[in-house]
Amino acid sequence: MIQQESRMKVADNSGAREVLTIKVLGGSGRKTANIGDVVVCTVKQATPGGVVKKGEVVKAVIVRTKSGARRQDGSYIKFDENACVIIRDDKSPRGTRIFGPVARELRENNFMKIVSLAPEVL
C-alpha cells in the first residue's frame, strides 16, 4: 500500500528515477493506494536529458507494491519493490518503454497502453 510521503521507483524511461507521493486520488480523505490506483507525485531523482525534470509534479499509476494485492480467486501478488509509471491525463504513459513486470490489475483499470508495453504481465 502506498500512502502520502511514500517513495517509489519509476518503471519507465520518462527520465524520472524516484518519486514521492503527494496525494492519493479517488475520493475524499482516501489514505492508501494499491496496484492500479493513480497518485500525484513529485520527482525526487531524475536522469539528465529526460522528459521529466526534478521537482516536477506528475500523475502516476502504481504498477508494483511490496504489500501486494488480493485477487478475486483468493491469491495474492507481491513484488520486491514499489514502482509506478508516469502518465498523462488521458491515462497514456509519458515514457515509451516499461521496465519490469506489471500486475494484471492494470488491465481491469483500462491502462491498456501500459499493459501492452510491459515485458511481462503477472
UniProtKB/Swiss-Prot annotation:
Keywords attached to this entry: Ribonucleoprotein, Ribosomal protein, RNA-binding, rRNA-binding
One GO BP annotation of this record: translation
One Gene Ontology cellular component annotation held by this UniProt entry: cytosolic large ribosomal subunit
CDD domains for the chain: Ribosomal_uL14
GO molecular function: large ribosomal subunit rRNA binding; structural constituent of ribosome
Cross-referenced InterPro entries: Ribosomal_uL14, Ribosomal_uL14_bac-type, Ribosomal_uL14_CS, Ribosomal_uL14_sf
Pfam families xref list: Ribosomal_L14
PROSITE patterns recorded: RIBOSOMAL_L14
UniProt entry tagged with the keyword Lipid biosynthesis: no
The protein's role, per its UniProt record: Binds to 23S rRNA. Forms part of two intersubunit bridges in the 70S ribosome.
Family named by the database record: Belongs to the universal ribosomal protein uL14 family.
Complex and partners: Part of the 50S ribosomal subunit. Forms a cluster with proteins L3 and L19. In the 70S ribosome, L14 and L19 interact and together make contacts with the 16S rRNA in bridges B5 and B8.
PANTHER family membership: 50S/60S RIBOSOMAL PROTEIN L14/L23, LARGE RIBOSOMAL SUBUNIT PROTEIN UL14M
Name of the protein this chain belongs to: Large ribosomal subunit protein uL14
Source organism of this protein record: Listeria monocytogenes serovar 1/2a (strain ATCC BAA-679 / EGD-e)
Top-level taxonomy: Bacteria, Bacillati, Bacillota, Bacilli, Bacillales
